[in-house]
Design a protein with these regions (language model features):
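Acidic/His- and Gly-rich active-site-bordering loop/insert found
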Residues: 1-102, 114, 118-127
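Divalent metal-coordination and catalytic microenvironments
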Residues: 21, 60, 76, 106, ...
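Active-site beta-loop-alpha junctions enriched in small/polar residues
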Residues: 26, 79-81, 138, 166, ...
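Histidine/acidic-residue-rich, glycine-tolerant segments that coordinate divalent metal ions
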Residues: 59, 83-85, 89-101, 108, ...
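Non-cysteine beta-strand/loop elements that form the S-adenosyl-L-methionine
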Residues: 75-77, 84, 188-190, 347-352
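Alpha-helix C-terminal capping segments
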Residues: 117-123, 151, 286, 340-342
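Metal-dependent amide/peptide-bond hydrolase catalytic core
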Residues: 213-395
Length: 395
């Protein structure tokens, strides 16, 4: 089965879906109308959507006509939330919601997965297994995948496929390389407690600001001295707050930041070193301190060679040997990693950077959009991967 021609037949319908959802973006955990509209379309295809009480997002199951004993279930995922961005694309179908925009291409993901589902439903009688459809909310705040998992979205699933349209990757290439693809992202909060004093008498207090500055400085050595230089690691301080008046030494400083790495081992080690730095630097200065670490997303890593091969062969089947291209791993993060922590998964990219056609904005930019001719390519990949996976794994 080759879904290229099927995708071309459905191209206009897929584009219509993209334009509809682009005009009606909703923020993370508020995708109420988006969820409802996706559900309507799934029902029109003959599916029974499963919704979550008090939360957004939905799932549905395609039961294959040739499913038998030992049948596999493969999941296909698309994220559905938008960003708090005022759109400046100039599109005729631009956002109707002030200050909210599909600036990361999730409108494209919705339409591509709907297109993939439509094509699979047209051939359900020949499908050698089941397909779980996941329209995931709250990716931008790294909450949606975790919620869906906790409420059974992966129950009975043997593997999962996801992909992202990407402004930093040349159109119309695809990428399904093995190994780490996107970094883990963790948030930290450091509190330094000293002793307040008058600015004229620093010896009478314990300067929380000076202590905090030393912690920031020492933390940079985690990257330069404790980490293998061939392993990307970023330790970033995003906020530092302390003091209320120019002539008073404050007794407290609070700092927050993020740690990003492509190594699960270094992820754990960084927390240990940062905790040690806080403990020892505050002790040297006569202060006290604490570190709170909030684990957000794991490393997105394509570690299952069978899935990598199925995805790459599917791409070549659809668009020929030249459709795949190298893409450097990146330090951005994705909560698709939560799904990969639970079941074998593959995560790919579809390039949208095309300066000749004027598509140069990156994801999260207020001018980000993509050539709609790419949508059928993403839709075909959803359907082709599911079909080929079930064909290969059929017992």
């Amino acid at each position: 089965m080759n879904f290229r021609e099927e995708a071309e037949k459905n191209e206009q319908w897929i584009i219509e879906q993209r334009r509809f959802f682009h005009q009606c973006p909703e923020l993370s955990e508020k995708e109420v109308n988006t969820t409802k509209e996706i559900g309507k379309r799934l029902e029109e295809m003959g599916l029974e959507p499963h919704y979550y009480d008090g939360y957004t997002g939905l799932t549905a199951d395609i039961k294959g006509g040739k499913a038998g004993a030992g049948t596999k279930t493969v999941a296909l995922r698309a994220d559905i939330d938008a960003l708090p961005v005022e759109e400046h694309t100039g599109l005729e179908f631009c956002s109707r919601n002030d200050g909210v925009m599909h600036a990361c291409g999730h409108d494209c993901h919705i339409s591509m997965l709907l297109g993939g589902v439509k094509m699979l439903m047209d051939h359900r009688d020949k499908l050698k297994g089941n397909v779980r459809i996941l329209f995931q909310p709250a990716e931008e705040v790294a909450m949606g995948a975790k919620y869906m998992i906790e409420h059974g979205a992966l129950d009975g699933v043997d593997a999962i496929y996801g992909a992202h349209i990407w402004g930093g990757f040349e159109a119309p290439y695809l990428n399904f390389e093995s190994g780490p693809r996107m970094a883990s992202c963790d948030e930290f909060r450091i509190e330094v407690n000293g002793l307040s004093a008058h600015g004229s008498s620093p010896h009478a207090g314990v300067d929380a600001i000076t202590t905090a500055i030393h912690i920031v400085s020492e933390a940079q050595e985690i990257v330069s001295r404790y980490n293998d230089p061939l392993n990307p690691l970023v330790v970033t301080f995003g906020t530092i707050n302390g003091g209320q008046r120019f002539n008073i030494i404050p007794n407290k400083v609070v700092m927050t930041g993020t740690v990003r790495t492509l190594s699960s081992e270094m992820r754990k080690k960084t927390e240990e070193i940062l905790r040690s730095i806080v403990e020892h630097v505050t002790a040297i200065h006569g202060a006290t301190g604490s570190l709170e670490m909030k684990y957000l997303t794991s490393v997105v890593s394509n570690d299952h060679e069978d899935l990598n091969q199925i995805a790459e062969k599917a791409a070549v089947k659809l668009y020929g040997e030249g459709c795949l291209k190298h893409l450097e791993k990146m330090m951005g993060s994705e909560d698709f990693s939560f799904f990969m922590d639970e079941v074998p998964g593959i995560y790919g990219f579809l390039g949208s950077y095309d300066p000749e056609k004027g598509y140069t904005a990156s994801n999260h930019n207020d001018c980000y959009t993509a050539d709609e001719g790419l949508l059928k390519r993403g839709a075909a990949m959803y359907a082709q991967f599911a079909w080929d996976y079930l064909e290969e794994k059929a017992e």
